[in-house]
Amino acid sequence: EIGAGVGRKDKTFNLNFMTPTEDDMVEVMWNDRTSAATREAALAFLESIRNIAIVTRREIKGFSLNRVWRAVKKECLRLWAEGYIDPHDLDRAFMLEWRTGYGPFGLMDKVGLDVVRDIELSYYRESGDESDLPPRALEEMVERGDLGEKSGRGFYEYPDPAYLRPGWLRGEGREEEG
């Protein structure tokens, strides 16, 4: 799709620099006509800026890693919005199980809850499938201005989110979380 308006589709590819940017990981996506020379040049460029290339072999909305992230994010939002689990408990479980520095809700706060909502709306506009709509509870957070890190409040309060506190992973301070 990115090359649709370009006369030389063999010279086009798409890059998605990951957040947080200090991860130095970039997803690169070819189209059906990206030439071998362009692929080699793209990979050489990413290596020259000390980024790790993750290759998506052909075009797909959202790249590969973001599609996997979307499935996780969508299910986490559903579990929260339908009252099955507290976001902090789900983040604790995720962080303990996969040894990460933050969980899905912490990551959504980093990305920005308005951005999370807009991405879900983009999928809905393309599919027309109501299951692609963001949950109303997320819409309400965005309407209140609770956008995550950038606004100081989202699923956590910033600049010192609960998941960085000593003992938080063990459930200490749970009653203070609200």
What are these regions (language model features)?
Residues 5-7, 11-14, 20, 33-41, ...:
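NAD(P)-dependent Rossmann-like dehydrogenase/reductase catalytic/cofactor-binding core
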Residues 77-79:
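C-terminal alpha-helical interaction appendages
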Residues 22-24:
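Gly-rich Lys/Arg/Thr-decorated short loops/hinges at beta-loop-alpha junctions or inter-strand turns
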Residues 27-30:
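Short, surface-exposed amphipathic charged segments that create phosphate/polyanion-binding patches used
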Residues 33, 69-75:
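Structural/interface elements that position substrates and couple domains in central-metabolism enzymes
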